[in-house]
Amino acid sequence: MRRELLLEKIETYKAIMPWYVLDYYQSKLAVPYSFTTLYEYLKEYKRFFDWLMDADLTQAPKIADIDLSTLEHLTKNDLEAFVLYLRERPSLNTYSTKEGLSQTTINRTLSALSSLYKYLTEEVENDQGEPYFYRNVMKKVSTKKKKETLASRAENIKQKLFLGDETLAFLDYVDKEYEQKLSNRAKSSFRKNKERDLAIISLLLASGVRLSEAVNLDLKDVNLNMMIIEVIRKGGKRDSVNVAGFAKGYLESYLAVRQRRYKAEKQDLAFFLTEYRGVPNRMDASSIEKMVGKYSEDFKIRVTPHKLRHTLATRLYDATKSQVLVSHQLGHSSTQVTDLYTHIVNDEQKNALDNL
């Protein structure tokens, strides 16, 4: 979704929200949470508030009038009824045969509500320096996680990674072969953005940064001499990230054409730009997702930018066997998250079984 459209949609949701949700939004904007995250959370709050009114758990005539006391006095049974509603509600997608929302979507909804409740009961301060209320019913609501061993998850993910020689082969394919299949009209569009697209893909594969971190990169954040970029991690922490050397040529090629091709002026701070009718804009997450999906599908299998992050992490662990190093590269505070990569790189286990 283009940044301008995203901000418009956010304003539409903000216009119907209660004052305390607007307080929450402003607080999280300062962290900073990404606009994409805040947009998704606002959507979940509307879903929840609509249900409160439909279930007669509030007498408010509209969402903006739902009082804080309503949230304060909701019971565990009330929230479980909401979860049941999500699980059994008819899907809004008329082409779907599912009766309700997926567990992943339900977990996302509950995560958004947990964040709001934590803010209202722990983080915010009223005039007396106290939170708005103390009872956090969301702490009593459990989420159901997908049951899958790390080995099973690793095997599923492994098929969607560009490991070994495939990392550079993918870049080489986009650089030299992809164009050969295109019509003359499509070639023109491809050539305009070729350097930029290769720079984005190479950066994701060479650094393992999250999509949002790549989107929010500014020119000042990129040091090609040191091959280091500065990013804002989850939670608003600034971090320096090393970038593998194979991306340098692609990044330099993009910088050589960035100003001329995308009509960039001094005020255009974004590193990755798109241009429409002569106006440069920061390239958004949706556009990068589509771009990565398009090239990867033509090369081997359609993947997301997050799979490119997994690719870097797996290759780095394979080369170092250090979960600590991988967790630092990815911006994780714990090595627990990196356990997955030890299961993807399981050649030793397979060799041991073969020798039995």
UniProtKB/Swiss-Prot annotation:
SUPFAM superfamilies: DNA breaking-rejoining enzymes. Transmembrane segments: none annotated. Keywords: Cell cycle, Cell division, Chromosome partition, Cytoplasm, DNA integration, DNA recombination, DNA-binding. One of its GO terms (biological process) is cell division. It comes from the Bacteria. This is Tyrosine recombinase XerS. Residues 169-354 form the Tyr recombinase domain. The lineage of its organism: Bacteria, Bacillati, Bacillota, Bacilli, Lactobacillales. GO terms for cellular component: cytoplasm. Pfam families: Phage_int_SAM_1, Phage_integrase. FtsK is required for recombination. Its main location: cytoplasm. One of its GO terms (molecular function) is DNA binding. It is found in: Cytoplasm. The keyword Secreted does not apply. Site-specific tyrosine recombinase, which acts by catalyzing the cutting and rejoining of the recombining DNA molecules. Essential to convert dimers of the bacterial chromosome into monomers to permit their segregation at cell division. Coiled coil: none annotated. Residues 16-121 form the Core-binding (CB) domain. Belongs to the 'phage' integrase family. XerS subfamily. PANTHER family: PHAGE INTEGRASE-RELATED, TYROSINE RECOMBINASE XERC. Gene3D superfamilies: 1.10.150.130, Intergrase catalytic core. The active site is at R210, K234, H306, R309, H332, Y341 (o-(3'-phospho-dna)-tyrosine intermediate). Disulfide bonds: none annotated.
